[in-house]
Curated annotation (Swiss-Prot):
Record-given protein name: D-ribitol-5-phosphate cytidylyltransferase
Site annotation Positions substrate for the nucleophilic attack: residues: R203, K261
Keyword Nucleotidyltransferase (UniProt): yes
MF terms in GO: cytidylyltransferase activity; D-ribitol-5-phosphate cytidylyltransferase activity; protein homodimerization activity
Site (Transition state stabilizer): R57, K64
Family that this chain belongs to: Belongs to the IspD/TarI cytidylyltransferase family. IspD subfamily.
GO cellular component: cytosol
The keyword Transferase belongs to this UniProt entry's keyword annotation: yes
Catalytic activity of the protein: D-ribitol 5-phosphate + CTP + H(+) = CDP-L-ribitol + diphosphate; D-ribose 5-phosphate + CTP + H(+) = CDP-D-ribose + diphosphate; D-ribulose 5-phosphate + CTP + H(+) = CDP-D-ribulose + diphosphate
Gene: Crppa
Job of this protein: Cytidylyltransferase required for protein O-linked mannosylation. Catalyzes the formation of CDP-ribitol nucleotide sugar from D-ribitol 5-phosphate. CDP-ribitol is a substrate of FKTN during the biosynthesis of the phosphorylated O-mannosyl trisaccharide (N-acetylgalactosamine-beta-3-N-acetylglucosamine-beta-4-(phosphate-6-)mannose), a carbohydrate structure present in alpha-dystroglycan (DAG1), which is required for binding laminin G-like domain-containing extracellular proteins with high affinity.
Length: 447
C-alpha cells in the first residue's frame, strides 16, 4: 500500500448535457500542495460522479445527494471540491431522468463549470458505465474528449482534497488502477447461514475501500464492456472489475479521514458541522477608524487572544481603497464595530458589497454589528429602541443568506469593565460565527 485512501445498458445511452455555461467563480479554500504543475505529469484527466441513488439507507424521500446542507444541495459541495482542481478537464455527473432538470438548475444557480450530465443507470455500476460512455468519444452529440486517466468519485463525498486526487491519479498512471483506502473502524465478521459467527477478519490486515479511485481510461472502459450482467447488477467495487476483467492490480493509496461518505441522516449533521468549521476559520473586523487605540482594534486583539485557532484580521470600510474586497474573497464572517451615528448607512454599505459578491450564494455569511457606548451614559433600553432598524434590515439580509445580528458592548471608562465587556463580546461573536444559527438573526445581544 502507498502511504499518504455499474451496468451495461441494453441500448447505448447518450450524453444528455454538454458543458455547463460560464458561472460564478468559487472562492475556494486553500488547496493542498500536491504539486505545482500536475497536469504536465498525468496528461488529460476527467472525472465521473455517479449521482443516481435514491437515498434508501438515509430513509428520506429526497435523494441524499440533493439534501440541503446549510441551504445548499450536498452535491454542489462535491462539485465545488472537484472544480477547484484545475487539471481535471471534464466532470461527468450521472443522474436519473427525473432529476435531470433539478441537476441543471443546481449547475446554473451555483455557477458550476466543466460539468456534463449523463443519464444514470439502474445500478451504481450501470451509472458509472454510462458516465464512461460520455467520455469515450463514441456517443453522438458529445463534446467531451477521451481522457488518459479517469477519476471515479461519489457525489456524496464532499470533502475530497486535491492531494488525495493527485496521489490516486499518479498511482493509476503508473499501475493502471488505484484507489483510496482507510483503516477499518469495526471488526468485520462473517455469519453462518443460521446467524452464528462463522469467522472474523483480522482488522489489522484489511482495509476499507474508499473513494476517489482512478484508472487508465482504456482499462476501466474495457472492464465495463466485458463486465457480466451479474457484476453490473450486484457489484460495487470498481477496482475489482479492473482486476477481474483486465488483470490490473490496483495500487492502494492511504486516504485521509475526511473521505467518508454521507450515508445516514446523522451524516448530514456531521457534514454541516465540518462545513461550518471550514468557513469559520477567519474573521474580518471592519472598523471605521485606523486609530490603533479604538475599541474596534481592542476588540480585534481580544478576539485574536480568545480564538487563537482562528485568523482575525481588520480593515476599514472604504470601497475606494479596495481593502474590503480583498477580504470578501476569503472570509465568511464580518464584525462591524460602530462608534458613530451612521451605523445604518455603514452596514448597508457592507451588505451591498457582499451582495455584489458570490459569497452568500455559496455559504451563509455572518455579519455582527458591535455597537459601543457607555451603559452609564446612555440607558440600555433607549439604545436598543434606537437600534430597532437592525431587525428589519436583518430580515432583508436573511433572504440573501446573510445572518445579521447585533452585540451591545459597554464602552466603559472603567478599564476593567471595558475589558470584561470585550471578552464577553468575543465569546458571543465566536458562538455566532461557529454556529451560524438563523434563529438569532436580528437579535441584539448584550455583552
Amino acid at each position: 500500500m502507498e502511504s499518504g485512501p455499474c451496468s451495461r445498458p441494453a441500448e447505448p445511452r447518450h450524453c444528455v448535457s454538454g458543458r455547463a455555461g460560464a458561472g460564478l467563480a468559487f472562492p475556494a479554500f486553500p488547496l493542498s500542495a500536491a504539486g505545482a504543475e500536475p497536469g504536465s505529469r498525468i496528461g488529460t484527466v476527467a472525472a465521473v460522479l455517479p449521482a443516481g441513488g435514491c437515498g434508501e439507507r438515509m430513509g428520506v424521500r429526497t435523494p441524499k445527494q440533493f439534501c440541503r446542507v446549510l441551504e445548499r444541495p450536498l452535491i454542489s459541495y462535491t462539485l465545488q471540491a472537484m472544480e477547484r482542481v484545475c487539471w481535471i478537464k471534464d466532470i461527468v455527473v450521472t443522474v436519473t431522468g427525473e432529476n435531470m432538470e433539478a441537476m441543471r438548475s443546481i449547475i446554473q444557480r451555483y455557477g458550476h463549470k466543466r460539468i456534463s450530465l449523463a443519464e444514470a443507470g439502474a445500478t451504481r455500476h450501470r451509472s458509472i458505465f454510462n458516465g464512461l460512455k460520455a467520455l469515450a468519444e463514441d456517443q453522438p452529440g458529445c463534446e467531451l474528449t477521451r481522457p488518459e486517466v479517469v477519476i471515479i468519485h461519489d457525489a456524496v463525498r464532499p470533502f475530497v482534497e486535491e492531494d488525495i486526487l493527485l496521489r490516486v491519479v499518479l498511482a493509476a498512471k503508473e499501475h493502471g488502477a488505484a484507489g483510496a483506502i482507510r483503516p477499518l473502524v469495526s471488526t468485520v465478521v462473517s455469519p453462518s447461514a443460521d446467524g452464528h459467527l462463522d469467522h472474523s477478519l483480522d482488522r489489522a490486515k484489511h482495509r476499507a475501500s474508499e473513494m476517489p479511485q482512478a484508472f487508465h481510461f482504456d482499462v476501466i472502459y474495457e472492464a465495463y464492456q466485458k463486465c457480466s450482467d451479474f457484476d453490473l447488477e450486484f457489484g460495487t467495487e470498481c477496482l475489482q472489475l479492473a482486476l477481474k476483467y483486465c488483470h490490473r492490480k490496483a495500487k492502494l493509496v492511504e486516504g485521509t479521514p475526511d473521505l467518508w461518505k454521507v450515508t445516514y441522516k446523522q451524516d448530514l449533521c456531521a457534514a454541516e458541522a465540518m462545513i461550518k468549521e471550514k468557513i469559520s476559520q477567519e474573521i474580518c473586523v471592519v472598523v471605521n477608524t485606523k486609530d490603533e487605540e479604538s475599541v474596534g482594534h481592542l476588540l480585534e486583539e481580544v478576539l485574536r487572544n480568545e480564538l487563537n485557532c482562528i485568523k482575525v484580521t481588520s480593515t476599514v470600510l472604504d470601497r475606494t481603497s479596495g481593502d474590503i474586497e480583498n477580504f470578501i474573497d476569503q472570509c465568511y464572517s464580518f464584525i462591524c464595530v460602530n462608534v458613530v451615528s451612521s451605523e445604518s448607512r455603514e452596514t448597508r454599505k457592507l451588505l451591498s458589497i457582499l451582495e455584489e459578491s458570490s459569497l452568500p450564494l455559496l455559504y451563509p455569511v455572518v455579519v455582527v454589528l458591535v455597537h459601543c457606548f457607555d451603559f452609564t451614559v446612555v440607558p440600555l433600553a433607549q439604545k436598543m429602541e434606537n437600534l430597532v432598524w437592525i431587525r428589519e434590515l436583518a430580515k432583508e439580509a436573511k433572504g440573501r443568506n446573510v445572518l445579521l445580528s447585533g452585540v451591545l458592548l459597554n464602552h466603559s471608562q472603567d478599564e476593567q469593565k471595558l475589558q470584561e465587556s470585550l471578552v464577553q463580546s468575543a465569546a458571543i461573536i465566536a458562538a455566532l460565527v461557529k454556529e451560524r444559527n438563523s434563529a438569532l438573526v436580528g437579535q441584539l445581544l448584550v455583552a
